[in-house]
Amino acid sequence: MKVVTGATDGIGRSYALDLARRGFNIFLISRTKSKLVKTKKQILNKYSDIEVRYAICDFTRVSYEDYKRLLHSLNEVDIGILINNVGMCFDNPEVLHRVEGGIDTLTNVINVNILPVTLLTAGILPQMMARKSGIIVNIGSAAGSIHMAKWSVYSATKKYIEWFTSILQKEYENEGIICQTITPLLVSTNMIKNPLSSIFCPNSDSFAKSSLNTIGNSSSTTGYITHQIQFELIKFVPEIIIDLFVKNLNNQLLDYQLDKKRV
């Protein structure tokens, strides 16, 4: 069974569909039952010879007991791949004390971006250890490698994922378990509020297919060739230039939001 969190939208949904295309049984985790039912139906309509299970979990509201119940359900099956995809971002770029929603939003971003990847990984590793086999894919972001003004908490939580996974690689390198970080740049999803795909901003289906092909070949990758090219080039760019790029990106996102409100 292959587990995908945040599995009913964007990259997560695309991961689930592509894993199903490859013939794997899927365990979907998301917060909205209607979307889970719809995604399960869509998968089975295309790939009727696989099994699809799901669990409802809102990671902004989940309690310790909720995590225990979820892990109990997950450990009832053999899990070959865990894709920790669920994530949350601010609606708009803003300095820390002015983030829309205030402390509630900041708490949600921290809870969604850090706790699931940590606790689900810890809860599923024992069965992978027993089999000496398993794959854990943690979805971060290139935002975790750049000091992104007006995205402070989001960027920091993505850095956590990168650091966390690199340590797991050291801890489990002799246990038959692959731990991989995916750090994409812009992907056309609802999270980034940008519906337009391009060669440098692929749609989620193209991205998921590409990134799944990197498993076992790279411990840390952007998951997509044009993203990797950009990421390697960024290493040679002075930080002052990167800051200007981030500022321009923030302005574009704000303009996009304003245009949506005018429609």
UniProtKB/Swiss-Prot annotation:
GO terms for molecular function: oxidoreductase activity. Keywords: Lipid biosynthesis, Lipid metabolism, NADP, Oxidoreductase, Steroid biosynthesis. This is Putative steroid dehydrogenase 4. InterPro entries: NAD(P)-bd_dom_sf, Sc_DH/Rdtase_CS, SDR_fam. SUPFAM superfamilies: NAD(P)-binding Rossmann-fold domains (SSF51735). Its EC number is 1.1.1.-. Belongs to the short-chain dehydrogenases/reductases (SDR) family. 17-beta-HSD 3 subfamily. GO terms for cellular component: endoplasmic reticulum.
